[in-house]
Amino acid sequence: CSIQTFYTDGKISIDKNLKEKLSSIPLDPNKNYHIGSGQSSDSLAVGNREGVLDAQLDFARKNSNIILEFKTKSKNIAHLLKTDIPDNVFVSWSLNPQIFIDHEEHGTASLDQRLSCAKSLSDKGVLVGFHFHPIVYYEGYEDDYKNIVNKVMSMFEPHQIAMISMGTLTFIKPAINKLRSAGLKSKVLQIPMVDAVGKSSYTKEVKAEIFSNVYNEFRAWHNDLFFYLCMEESSIWESVFGDFYKSNVDFETALFESVSSKMKPLEIA
């Protein structure tokens, strides 16, 4: 994953004092926060070693003005299944065709395992979410992603899902250099890309096409779910959704209100 460029020594560490550090964060009680755990790693990769999951769950339990999102590509949900999960916590999975998982997402759970884990937590009453990220453009991608959408819609109801996001392959130069120097077997750097606001990604036209294709497969859920694009320009939002948020604050407010409305006792500050 390109986020490996966030780290310099390649080591994975676990913070033994996470609970204390979280409790020292100065949160404004009059503001709302959407906190994503696993943004540059994987929230469930190490389970509850050193109490890292319990520390985060306790943090969410004590702060009703936050939404805590665990982001993962794993099947490591054993601790969450046997633990009380606060209502303001949800778990999200990245979804991609199995062929992409096999060739690019080494060591992660299969597509069916991810969906099965999401269903297990959903059956427990835990809200789940899905990230179609990165959506990869290749011959036949439409049918592969349509298959994923059909699986999601057959296994879940809209009220069980916090949100669905979409994003594409986007690289900063250090990430490209890191992937090349690592010598990993990957085809992602063979994909034709252009400069996109200082990064390498698909053209705007290709992005609009792939986002629209996936979004339109969810047409029956358009009014019941919060859909958004990951780090895309307003012109692409408008092309896909017919509108865009005028500011990041507007987007964050809309996301928080939509997700929190599906969380039973969560109070909006």
Locate the predicted segments by residue.
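Structured alpha-helical segments in the cores of large, soluble enzyme domains
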Residues: 21-28, 79-84, 111-124, 214
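Auxiliary Fe-S-binding modules of radical SAM enzymes
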Residues: 153-269
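A conserved active-site cap/scaffold subdomain adjacent to cofactor or substrate pockets
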Residues: 122-132, 139
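Alpha-helix N-cap and loop-to-helix initiation/capping positions
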Residues: 13, 17, 48-51, 106-113, ...
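Conserved radical SAM core fold
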Residues: 40-44, 75-78, 89-108, 134-139, ...
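Catalytic cores of alpha/beta
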Residues: 140-155, 237
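Hydrophobic faces of well-ordered beta-strands that scaffold small-molecule active sites
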Residues: 33-37, 68-70, 91-93, 128-132, ...
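Conserved Radical SAM active-site core
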Residues: 2-92
